[in-house]
């Protein structure tokens, strides 16, 4: 398994309960596919560098995980489909 950092931005209009459910759902996608979540950071609502779908703000979430390729691919696939996630990026951390 490799270390990854995942950052995703949630649409600002999502209610707090739905936002928590979304975060838990995507954490579940990773853990159900064999990933281990090391750290979760909620950056909260921040201004976007540029407009995405006419939106200027979003809720930022950052995850550090140990995962295999299958877990990352499934997360990526579902994040692309979900309309409440504006953008996401997965970065592989280098071995030291």
From Swiss-Prot:
InterPro entries: Ribosomal_bS6 (IPR000529), Ribosomal_bS6_CS (IPR020815), Ribosomal_bS6_sf (IPR035980), Ribosomal_S6_plastid/chlpt (IPR020814), Transl_elong_EF1B/ribsomal_bS6 (IPR014717). Keywords: Ribonucleoprotein, Ribosomal protein, RNA-binding, rRNA-binding. Gene3D superfamilies: 3.30.70.60. The keyword Disulfide bond does not apply. One of its GO terms (cellular component) is cytoplasm. One of its GO terms (biological process) is translation. It comes from the Bacteria. The keyword Ion transport does not apply. Pfam families: Ribosomal_S6. GO terms for molecular function: small ribosomal subunit rRNA binding; structural constituent of ribosome. CDD domains: bS6. PANTHER family: MITOCHONDRIAL 28S RIBOSOMAL PROTEIN S6, SMALL RIBOSOMAL SUBUNIT PROTEIN BS6M. Binds together with bS18 to 16S ribosomal RNA. Belongs to the bacterial ribosomal protein bS6 family. This is Small ribosomal subunit protein bS6. It comes from Bacillus anthracis. The gene is rpsF.
């Amino acid at each position: 398994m490799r270390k990854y950092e995942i950052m995703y931005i949630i649409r600002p209009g999502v209610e707090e309960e739905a936002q928590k459910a979304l975060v838990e759902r995507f954490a579940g996608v990773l853990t159900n596919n064999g990933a281990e979540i090391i750290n979760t950071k909620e950056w909260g609502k921040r201004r976007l560098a540029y407009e995405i779908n006419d939106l200027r703000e979003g809720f930022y979430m950052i995850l550090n995980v140990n995962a295999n390729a299958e877990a990352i691919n499934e997360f990526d696939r579902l994040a692309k489909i979900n309309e409440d996630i504006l953008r996401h990026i997965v970065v592989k951390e280098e071995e030291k």
